[in-house]
Amino acid sequence: MLSRLFRMHGLFVASHPWEVIVGTVTLTICMMSMNMFTGNDKICGWNYECPKFEEDVLSSDIIILTITRCIAILYIYFQFQNLRQLGSKYILGIAGLFTIFSSFVFSTVVIHFLDKELTGLNEALPFFLLLIDLSRASALAKFALSSNSQDEVRENIARGMAILGPTFTLDALVECLVIGVGTMSGVRQLEIMCCFGCMSVLATYFVFMTFFPACVSLVLELSRESREGRPIWQLSHFARVLEGEENKPNPVTQRVKIIMSLGLVLVHAHSRWIADPSPQNSTADNSKVSLGLDENVSKRIEPSVSLWQFYLSKMISMDIEQVITLTLALLLAVKYIFFEQAETESTLSLKNPITSPVVTQKKVTDDCCRREPTLVRNDQKFHTVEEEARINRERKVEVIKPLVAETDTSSRPTFVVGNSTLDSSLELEMQEPEIQIPSEPRPNEECLQILGNAEKGAKFLSDAEIIQLVNAKHIPAYKLETLMETHERGVSIRRQLLSKKLPEPSSLQYLPYRDYNYSLVMGACCENVIGYMPIPVGVAGPLCLDGKEFQVPMATTEGCLVASTNRGCRAIGLGGGASSRILADGMTPVVRFPRACDSAEVKAWLETPEGFAVIKEAFDSTSRFARLQKLQMSVAGRNLYIRFQSRSGDAMGMNMISKGTEKALSKLHEYFPEMQILAVSGNYCTDKKPAAVNWIEGRGKSVVCEAVIPAKVVREVLKTTTEAMVEVNINKNLVGSAMAGSIGGYNAHAANIVTAIYIACGQDAAQNVGSSNCITLMEASGPTNEDLYISCTMPSIEIGTVGGGTSLLPQQACLQMLGVQGACKDNPGENARQLARIVCGTVMAGELSLMAALAAGHLVRSHMIHNRSKINLQDLQGTCTKKAA
């Protein structure tokens, strides 16, 4: 029951991090300002002359206080040193944040809530540092860091709170009761220190239960789109640590603590309420205190400096003991930051058998491109625990290795994608001691029992046994990744299943699948995965657009495309750059339904301001970014087709606006109950199909881009003339496309550039059908009409920087090259609009270069040279009649 309450609390805190953090900070500020209204303005030494303010402090007290401070600093140093052994800098950062905020809360309580002076912190902070325990904070952080997604982060934080919360609560209660005994000693300094200790425990407990889990959840959520190759919380080697015994409370210890707590409660109750001193003694003591106060009355004085200068001077003036403490802290900090890195790395390398030389020495000569760590059997005698564990892991690999198909072990090139530590973390999960898997497949019943066992699972089954279960229909082939301990093993088994059904079993030999972060693919980008397709990525640029320079990534297998686009970018740059504007921004899915009461009546109602306002309110309520702009309707018999045009922020927007469309239809159904919805999409959008409606009305981002190329650049870079390019553009792009009955195809090869950028940047490649709509216009300009004016208008660029393939790390790298990765925080939607402008500008560069090649007669020659380099084409003549003068 108690664990369930803590679990609910942890889930709430992790699910609402902003609310909890803001509430905690607000409460802290309230405590800071509480005595501004209830307390007095007496500050000894500034506006009051207090006779008792300057007290003689015994040298023994100074020595004890200095030793206490040094011990506290050493204690914190060793705690952080232990955290570094885990090999994660994120735990260090989170633990440091926990320490800083706990100290801030505690200091606030001491200074303001109890109306204490800053001098009280000299005694308070050492005890706070001695009582803080980062092990619990790091344990909760490890729960969160073992997650693969944000939802799993919340669940793991809730699970960690359920496990650690009751234990931590009991520990805090026991510590407060034990330390609180000192407040009844009658020794004033001991009572003050014990009071500080109790407040330290309570402040730490408060932060651990509220601010810390919320902050962990928020930090990991903001770090989802990490630049380091994978999400920072994917530290899979923590998963096994979390299942260990250290997080499970010892029932014997818990009972002892409960009994101790009850005994201490009785002690406190007897001392504070039952054994109160007699009223006579209290009266006498009070009279003595009052007499003492009368003799030492504080006198108000005029401040000579401002309050902040007074506090600053007190903090700057340092005694010898403060110098000693600060020097020790600085020395340890320098040692920790600069001199322990190499030592820690060497220690971690010794603890990690995957990175040891014994592990990696075998495959060095086999294939330099293939990274497949294989453990080597060593017949020497070992005596350490680490080496014995390594031998057990080697035996396990030797048992599993013969089950791999022969084609998998053959030498072949394998591409490396993502962080190399991903393999290590995945292999760490599989390498557990004492896992013996027989070479012969076991019966299906036994395999099913092992698979359903929560403590064993698929890692205790061989690949042959998994294939046997799939063939027997016990495991669906599409669920292999979710049932295996690693996604990569699921992909490997599917490849083995598929290879047996192909005409050529070795067909998948050159399709790589290793070293890829499949956690970003599953449930988002692809199903039934058998590998990934490496495509060459070139760069064109710099593209000078709107006063900025962009290096444009292009993924293509067409020779000359990147080189041609790069030449166009150079010509635009020499001409002073290009300018672009967004003409419209919106996505337009469609719904289709038969006559609700009458199609014309519904159409007329939707065209009224009242009807549009009702639909817009329902539509806008489904998203922070989707905002309905207008409705466009068309009637065909009994059917009514509606185009919803809406802004979609930085996303491409189909899913976002489909959700808004469903909500709007539900609201429309309330006004017309007899309405019947046939399909959410009725092809009036139109999505991924050539259509005049997108060419005329626009879809996604509508962009126009223009540039002026000087005559000198046309002659020297493009190797042609303005007159020739204008004539070819009219006869090819305009007249030729019209003769072909083209819709939106009044360009030379816009689809080439659009598709190459889409593949490189994680866009939906099929969207190039509508996104490639473009009209290229050229005309002579300048004083002598020798300069070339070129413009490209693209009314339907469907593009986004969040969601879909943009979550994959290689595609994110290409988006980062352009500075548009993820959502724009300052102006939602700006990244997607900027990417659309870059696409249009790059298309214009490609159009410029290709039209120049056509005008100069270089197109066939360049393609034949680059794509068929063995053919001698020195005497090949151009094919165009118009050439450069």
Swiss-Prot record:
Parts of the chain on the Cytoplasmic side: 1-9, 79-89, 150-159, 221-248, 340-885
A Pfam family the protein falls into: Sterol-sensing
Cross-link annotation Glycyl lysine isopeptide (Lys-Gly) (interchain with G-Cter in ubiquitin), location: K89, K248
Catalytic activity: (R)-mevalonate + 2 NADP(+) + CoA = (3S)-3-hydroxy-3-methylglutaryl-CoA + 2 NADPH + 2 H(+)
Pathway(s): Metabolic intermediate biosynthesis; (R)-mevalonate biosynthesis; (R)-mevalonate from acetyl-CoA: step 3/3
Modified sites of kind Phosphoserine: S869
Post-translational modification: Undergoes sterol-mediated ubiquitination and ER-associated degradation (ERAD). Accumulation of sterols in the endoplasmic reticulum (ER) membrane, triggers binding of the reductase to the ER membrane protein INSIG1 or INSIG2. The INSIG1 binding leads to the recruitment of the ubiquitin ligase, AMFR/gp78, RNF139 or RNF145, initiating ubiquitination of the reductase. The ubiquitinated reductase is then extracted from the ER membrane and delivered to cytosolic 26S proteosomes by a mechanism probably mediated by the ATPase Valosin-containing protein VCP/p97.
InterPro entries: HMG_CoA_Rdtase, HMG_CoA_Rdtase_cat_sf, HMG_CoA_Rdtase_CS, HMG_CoA_Rdtase_eu_arc, HMG_CoA_Rdtase_metazoan, HMG_CoA_Rdtase_N, HMG_CoA_Rdtase_NAD(P)-bd_sf, HMG_CoA_Rdtase_sub-bd_dom_sf
Name of the protein in its database record: 3-hydroxy-3-methylglutaryl-coenzyme A reductase
